Each structure stands twice: as structure tokens, then as C-alpha cells.
A protein has these predicted regions:
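Amphipathic alpha-helical assembly/interaction segments
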Residues: 1-123
Length: 123
């Protein structure tokens, strides 16, 4: 079976694991949030890996960097949703800090990837 380039990215693998953990986390949110916060956070966390996958199919490094940047911004969107979940007492402060740490790790790796893509497009 062929492995696509995005599947080899450590940051994509982290985003994949993070998505699963967020899906499991939101299962304990109140049912009235199904079409609100749950839907929003699932969409944003899914977009992290999706942007990396889509960007890997682009030809130029500048285009790849654009999609990596979009993955970065959706990671921050996910952070915002986690802050809302904490504010609404859907998650504890400890849970929030655990997920925030994972987000920081992902954003650091996304920044590094984006910088390498930008540098490769500007020799």
C-alpha cells in the first residue's frame, strides 16, 4: 500500500492522535451542544490534518506553506473552542492544560514546517 507524503509528517500524526482525543473528549459534553460547540470543535480539529493532506498535493512550496498556515490557524481555532469548553465547565482546568500542551506541540511543529517550506520556496 502506498504511503502519501503527508502521512509521513510527524505533525500530521500528532494531529491525527489529537483529533481522536478531542472526539473522545466531546462525547462527555452536554447533548444540547451537539450542533454547537461539539460540531465546531470537531470541524476545526479535523481541519488540521485535512489542511496538511491537501497541502501535500500542491506543487509549489509556497502553496504547501499556505496550507500549513491554514492548519496552524485551525489549530488556534481549536484552542479557542477548548477555552470555551473550560469556561462553560465542560472540561476541567487540568484537562484544558493537557490539551493546550498538545496544541502547543502541534503549533511549534507546524511553524517549523511552514518556515522550511517558505525557505525552500525562496532560495
Amino acid at each position: 500500500m502506498h504511503t502519501y507524503s503527508f502521512e509521513k509528517l510527524e505533525v500530521w500524526q500528532l494531529a491525527r492522535t489529537f483529533r481522536k482525543s478531542i472526539y473522545l473528549l466531546t462525547a462527555k459534553f452536554p447533548k444540547e451542544e451537539t450542533f454547537g460547540l461539539i460540531s465546531q470543535i470537531k470541524r476545526s480539529v479535523s481541519s488540521i490534518g485535512a489542511c496538511l493532506a491537501e497541502g501535500s498535493g500542491k506543487i509549489t512550496m509556497k502553496d504547501k506553506a499556505h496550507y500549513t498556515n491554514m492548519a496552524y490557524t485551525t489549530t488556534l481555532e481549536t484552542l479557542n473552542h477548548l477555552i470555551a469548553a473550560m469556561d462553560l465547565d465542560y472540561i476541567t482546568n487540568e484537562e484544558y492544560l493537557t490539551y493546550r500542551s498538545k496544541i502547543e506541540n502541534i503549533t511549534i511543529k507546524l511553524s517549523g514546517l511552514r518556515n522550511s517550506q517558505i525557505n525552500a520556496s525562496n532560495p
